[in-house]
Amino acid sequence: MYIFCFGLFSATVIWGSFDIQLKYFINSITQKRTKIKEIALTFDDGPTEFTPKFLDLLKEKNIKATFFCIGKRIEKYPKIFQRIIAEGHSIGNHTYSHSNNTGFLSSSKMIEEIEKCDEVISKIGNIKTNFYRPPFGVTNPNIAKAIKKTQKKSIGWNVRSLDTVIDNEKKIYNRITKNLNKGSIILLHDTSEKTYNVLVELLLFLEREKYSTFTMDSMINSTNND
């Protein structure tokens, strides 16, 4: 019985670590409370060489999004990062290095990752951001401590496109549209031609279904003004 209970507890903790929607360790924002048809487009892991195409499309459709950027990639593509800001999109912190070992880092190392990314954002973009998205959506007590120490708002999602895992564009598109509802926060990545092609079709869908969009900045501002 003890072994069973321990196993169940361990499974729950592991599941809670990898499913940001459960809010097991961190009370992340995963959806906007709203009665109207509006959603948020969020892009992780940029800026990259693909980001300008995404920006061109968003500009053409007059849509604002939120980009959760990696510090070292901001350093690699400073002009692209500055363009994201100049075109009115929201910015979030996605750590400096997006380490594959994120779930195993100490709280002090996580604080360092977040603060170093903040420094790059400030230096190159001349802005500050209160938003943070955990790499891979992984949360645990150390990450929770780091978020509290750095005074960030953790932003998750309720529609995960799996665009870095699924190769078929149609399957990604169907996965998003099937799970979409009022206030959804969609997780995408501005890192491939594949996701760009999905975005083209997704924006047409949003237009047909009369969805508007919101950014993390506009969501927080509207909440503060309620």
Where are these regions (language model features)?
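Acidic-and-aromatic substrate-binding clefts and catalytic sites of carbohydrate-active enzymes
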Residues: 46-49, 69-77, 101-108, 133-139, ...
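Catalytic grooves of carbohydrate-active enzymes
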Residues: 180-219
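A cross-domain feature marking catalytic cores of carbohydrate-active enzymes
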Residues: 43-45, 69-71, 93-95, 134-136, ...
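Hydrophobic membrane-insertion alpha-helices, especially the h-region
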Residues: 1-12
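Catalytic-site microenvironment of enzymes
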Residues: 54, 205-208, 226
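Active-site beta->alpha N-cap acidic-glycine motif
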Residues: 13-102, 113-116, 120-123, 127-129, ...
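His/Asp/Glu-enriched short active-site or ligand-binding loop at hydrolase and phosphoryl-transfer sites
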Residues: 138-140, 144-179, 211-223
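CE4/NodB-like, metal-dependent polysaccharide N-deacetylase domain
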Residues: 56-59, 63-68, 89-90, 107-138, ...
